């Protein structure tokens, strides 16, 4: 089945860069999803740019193309990893390879899990560990 690439502006500076999976029929291996599912990822364009989450491993090329289109020639400053379920995190290593200057933002537990998921990935000098209640200012957007 042909994959359909999705790209849409949510606001002038928040862009949906996720992908739709019409092949999957079970979410989490147990819940029927007869129309497939979306793997959500967003790009925030501000003084600093942030990519929110990655997508399922089977959609690396489509997702990276969507991110590049959303960035429109800019380089991402941050990859925000909200949690390590594979449909949100499978392409962290691909992102780091594509954008080696970007900083990966996550909490302590998430970084510990990343080591298990991606044992060869080197984040030395490229990670920002956040704690509950901390904020990250991108410009007019502040992530908490």
Tell me the role of every PLM-derived stretch:
Residues 1-7:
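Short, Lys/Arg-enriched N-terminal segments with co-localized hydrophobic residues
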Residues 7-67:
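Conserved beta-strand hairpin/beta-sheet module of binuclear metal-dependent hydrolase folds
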Residues 9-12, 106-144:
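Metallo-beta-lactamase
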Residues 26, 91-92, 115-116:
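Short glycine-/acidic-enriched loop or helix-start segments at secondary-structure transitions
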Residues 49-50, 78, 141:
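Structural motif
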Residues 58-105:
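Active-site metal-binding motif and surrounding structural segment of the metallo-beta-lactamase
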């Amino acid at each position: 089945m042909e994959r359909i690439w999705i790209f849409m502006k949510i606001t002038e500076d928040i862009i949906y860069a996720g992908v739709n999976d019409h092949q999957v029929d079970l979410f989490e291996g147990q819940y029927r999803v007869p129309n497939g599912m979306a793997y959500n990822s967003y790009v925030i364009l501000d003084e600093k740019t942030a990519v929110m989450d990655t997508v399922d491993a089977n959609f690396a090329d489509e997702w990276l193309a969507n991110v590049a289109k959303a960035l429109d020639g800019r380089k991402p400053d941050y990859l925000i990893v909200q949690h390590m379920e594979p449909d949100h995190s499978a392409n962290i290593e691909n992102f780091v390879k594509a954008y080696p200057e970007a900083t990966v933002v996550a909490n302590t537990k998430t970084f510990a899990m990343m080591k298990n998921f991606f044992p060869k990935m080197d984040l030395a000098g490229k990670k920002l560990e956040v704690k509950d209640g901390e904020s990250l200012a991108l410009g007019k957007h502040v992530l908490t």
